[in-house]
């Protein structure tokens, strides 16, 4: 049985992760951690850590995980470029699954988006829309950013130059190479994501809607189990699910 450290235990996702770990017959909660608590004692007694806390905690977690040779599943979003680079650097020493979304359905959306972009992208106007609950603190969501990165790569565009975050005022006709990004917040929406490919005469929409955080939590536990025995490296949920081989 794999012993798992759950960080950010007081948060919504921390609670969901704890429940998912408890429900899985192959895992147990070895320890939990929250802001202000010492990390080493909690990490030392576990086989792997699942982190859905806050991006500002990532540097501390990475340092302790590397020092103690512990695999990590990182689901926190909103990282700065420096923090993302720290994750890449740490993956040279330990195996890390780093994903913006651990839902199996969302990762199918990632795969489908890449394929659709390869078929349609060059001739379509592309827009990404996401909606989350009123308490979410970052925008756009990590999942929406991943979708835009997938789209940019699939149609050979630069993310920074192509993505436009919302529109206001007299912006003029839509440039063909734009990828529009739109964030909505309200209510208790767990997470909705839509990719739109619009051309003259037709429109393709790919949509995923999550109704429970348990879908993310169960995917993160699946990733933690998959990490056991892996070589150091930076992995994604597409690796965990085998989608990168399709």
From Swiss-Prot:
UniProt keywords, alphabetically: Amino-acid biosynthesis, Cytoplasm, Diaminopimelate biosynthesis, Lysine biosynthesis, NAD, NADP, Oxidoreductase
GO molecular function, one term: 4-hydroxy-tetrahydrodipicolinate reductase
Record-level GO cellular component terms: cytosol
Subcellular location: Cytoplasm
One of the Pfam families matching this protein, by short name: DapB_C
Active site per the UniProt annotation: 132, 136
Chain coiled-coil ranges: none
GO biological process: diaminopimelate biosynthetic process; lysine biosynthetic process via diaminopimelate
Residues that bind (S)-2,3,4,5-tetrahydrodipicolinate: 133, 142-143
Enzyme class (EC, first level): oxidoreductase
Residues that bind NAD(+): 8-13, 75-77, 99-102
Catalytic activity of the protein: (S)-2,3,4,5-tetrahydrodipicolinate + NAD(+) + H2O = (2S,4S)-4-hydroxy-2,3,4,5-tetrahydrodipicolinate + NADH + H(+); (S)-2,3,4,5-tetrahydrodipicolinate + NADP(+) + H2O = (2S,4S)-4-hydroxy-2,3,4,5-tetrahydrodipicolinate + NADPH + H(+)
CDD domains xrefs: DHDPR_N
Pathway: Amino-acid biosynthesis; L-lysine biosynthesis via DAP pathway; (S)-tetrahydrodipicolinate from L-aspartate: step 4/4
EC number: 1.17.1.8
Annotated InterPro entries: DapB_C (IPR022663), DapB_N (IPR000846), DapB_N_CS (IPR022664), DHDPR_bac (IPR023940), NAD(P)-bd_dom_sf (IPR036291)
Predominant subcellular localization, coarse grouping: cytoplasm
Record bears the keyword Oxidoreductase: yes
Function: Catalyzes the conversion of 4-hydroxy-tetrahydrodipicolinate (HTPA) to tetrahydrodipicolinate.
Family: Belongs to the DapB family.
Name of the molecule in the record: 4-hydroxy-tetrahydrodipicolinate reductase
Organism field: Akkermansia muciniphila (strain ATCC BAA-835 / DSM 22959 / JCM 33894 / BCRC 81048 / CCUG 64013 / CIP 107961 / Muc)
Gene: dapB
């Amino acid at each position: 049985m794999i012993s798992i450290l759950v960080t950010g235990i007081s948060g919504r996702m921390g609670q969901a992760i704890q429940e998912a770990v408890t429900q899985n017959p192959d895992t147990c909660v070895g320890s939990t951690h929250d802001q202000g608590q010492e990390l080493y004692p909690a990490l030392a007694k576990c086989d792997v850590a699942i982190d859905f806390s806050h991006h500002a905690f990532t540097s501390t977690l990475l340092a302790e995980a590397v020092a103690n040779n512990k695999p990590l599943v990182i689901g926190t979003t909103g990282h700065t470029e420096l923090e993302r680079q720290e994750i890449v650097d740490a993956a040279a020493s330990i195996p890390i699954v780093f994903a913006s979304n651990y839902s199996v359905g969302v990762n199918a959306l990632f795969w489908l988006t890449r394929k659709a972009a390869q078929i349609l992208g060059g001739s379509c106007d592309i827009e990404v829309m996401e909606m989350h609950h009123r308490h979410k603190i970052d925008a756009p969501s990590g999942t929406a950013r991943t979708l835009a990165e997938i789209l940019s790569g699939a149609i050979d565009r630069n993310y920074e130059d192509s993505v436009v975050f919302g529109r206001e005022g007299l912006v003029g006709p839509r440039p063909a190479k734009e990828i529009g990004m739109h964030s909505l917040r309200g209510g208790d929406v767990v997470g909705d994501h839509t990719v739109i490919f619009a051309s003259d005469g037709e429109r393709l929409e790919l949509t995923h809607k999550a109704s429970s955080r348990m879908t993310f939590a169960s995917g993160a536990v699946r990733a933690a189990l998959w990490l056991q025995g892996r070589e150091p490296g930076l992995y994604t949920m597409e690796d965990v699910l085998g989608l990168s081989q399709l």
